[in-house]
Amino acid sequence: MSLFLIGLGLTNALAGNTDASPKIINGEEATAEDYPMTGGMLMDAIFSFGGSGEQAIRTFVCSSTLIAPDVVLLAAHCIDPFAFTFGFGDLSDVDLRWSRMADLSDHDGTQIAAWPSDAIVAWDWVMHPSWDMEAMETGVAINNDIGLLFLDEPVLDVEPAYLLSVDEESQMVEGALVDVVGWGQQIATDFWEAPPAGSYGYKMMGTSSIDELGTHEFHVGADSEDVRKCHGDSGGPSFMAVESESIEPMRLVGVTSHAYDNSDCNETGGVDTRVSVFADWIEAEMIARCDDGTRAWCDEPGLLVAPTELPGGEDTGFIDGEDPAGGCACSSTSSNPMNGLAWLPFVFGWLGTRRRSVLRET
């Protein structure tokens, strides 16, 4: 099956492909201030070809979201070595970092560029224990494609994203609008084809909808005219506005995982992991690293709860229908979970797009 990841295979020179005429996948450009809790995960590593040499790599891998000052939520396949090697080699000296920069195009896999100026080292990362890339299913299924990064230092100037509470869960229904963010492809291409220059590695956002809702996953962007996620958007968020007593109505409800069917990014969009289903696992991993003293920030060891008032009880200053966040992922797929996962090109990176207004009249 195809994941929305772009890891290593862009060495066929993006710069040489200059046809940028096709329409982007229905999103709009975003800045670092739009959905400021979102970021890109980059990887530096040595890929060994099993006796046939080795190659140094440094590349953007996945989109992602800050859920605590030092914790980043993303897809499990973004940090699974098998997603890069497919068993044909090994990764060593792996260095993962997280950046909020809107332009990560220098890290498209064609060169070893300097780290982004704001890049923070991840000291630890973990995949869900039931994740198995070789057993992935297409459509809306149960794949457990979710993981965490733990940062060396906390990000204290950005409000993290909040997950759905138990009471808010019932608001997640088919037809609900979701805002998506990612650094992935803006133009759908064939699996082995590099995206046109200027159409990958830039932060994008847009509004789509939940078209099919399962117990553990949901489908986003069912039609070709919808905002759709693509390679590079893997790990990235889907946000949904909820009715709540909280002053922050935006909730992180999905993590971009994989394409819906064989049409890849071209027509039917992608599938997200439902975040709230895994809330207990996420919180347990967060608390465990506070209990053993390894986390960088433990003012609140577990999942953060959306505030009901500003510090000091001040009024929010926002009017009804205004977004207090300021505007806060497609892989190729197949009926055979591993069919189409050609080694190292476009595997990790679902990205979508998200508009500035999470709150709107519906």
What is each PLM-predicted segment?
Residues I6-Y35, D291-V305, E309, E314-D320, ...:
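Boundary/junction segments of secreted and surface-exposed precursor proteins
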Residues V358-T362:
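Cytoplasmic C-terminal tails of single-pass
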Residues I142-R228, V275-D280:
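Chymotrypsin/trypsin-fold serine protease catalytic domain
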Residues T18-E33, E54-A56, F84-D157, A161-E169, ...:
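Conserved catalytic-core segment of clan PA serine endopeptidases
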